[in-house]
Amino acid sequence: MTARNGYAWALGLACLLGAAPPGAAARDAPFDDSAIVRAEDPAWFKTSFLDLRDDLAEARTAGKQGLMLLFSTEGCAYCKAFIERSLKDPAIGARVRENFDTIHLEIFDDAGMKDLQGRSLPVKHFARREGAAFSPTLLFYGLDGKLMHRVVGYQSPERFRVVLDYVAGGHHRTLSYRDYLARQASGRPAAGQPAALVRDPLFERPPYVLDRRRPAGKPLLVLFEQPGCEACRDFHANVLSDPGVRTLLARFQAVQLDARDAATPVLAPDGRKLTPLRWAEELGLAHLPALVFFDETGREVLRNDALSYRQRTLRSLQYVLDKAYQRGILFQRYTREKTMERLKAGQ
């Protein structure tokens, strides 16, 4: 298997893992991501005094591999689903407890903490520094205090089991997660795939001329998918069909690309000639469908390669159209502000 074929297979496995396994449809059914909800933490979560060096020392004494930090935001439907469906699964919870002490942090918490180097800073600054820009985000730290792996977005039980296999099994020491997925996929029998993506008239057809070295009149959305991806079909059926999403999407130059396509030429925003596979490989996408947003000058301003239902997709489109990134506002902060506006309006 070549490196590029391996990457395509890795994306294929990511799509496969995005679907509920047999018998688990009810447990991993779609949820309303506009709901403002709260989940109770499992009883085995660690009560931390927010000195991560002390927490790591206690994990070492207990014979564990390190720390798992869960970053969430208040009212986050994706966080609740992950906690209720994955972390409260008895077998998954037992494996996490065996290998990691788990600490739950709030992305916007003003409380002070000490990081793994003993530096004092607010939790919210630590979250931003460590790349916890979406909720939920998981950060795994080893006993040496180094980051082992970062996981962004809702993880179904099936996907999270693979994450745990990768980290707890020590594969992060020798393989990137992408290469690990490719290795797992190489052992699976090939399945028949539909010949084409689900097409939508809001997306431009080839030739894909996305060069923005001379500023364009609209922002750009590149949607990476692949044939046979159940999550991609669901995204078209349940999200892209929404009138509000379609109204906002019409204000973008929008293209959909097959992340396995190693032949179709694409003139990228920076003027380079690529194929969809090469571009997806460079971006290191971990989940399909993936939405990558660029401003009028070709600068990437937002990437969402985690599970995204209607509300998060609407917020992503609005974030780019409002140019909130120009004010230094991260996506999760923007989402929180919009949620507070909804609460004040009684919606």
Model region roles, listed by residue range:
Residues G18-A19, R27:
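Compositionally biased, intrinsically disordered/low-complexity regions enriched for serine, proline
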Residues M1-A10:
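Bacterial N-terminal signal peptides that target proteins for export
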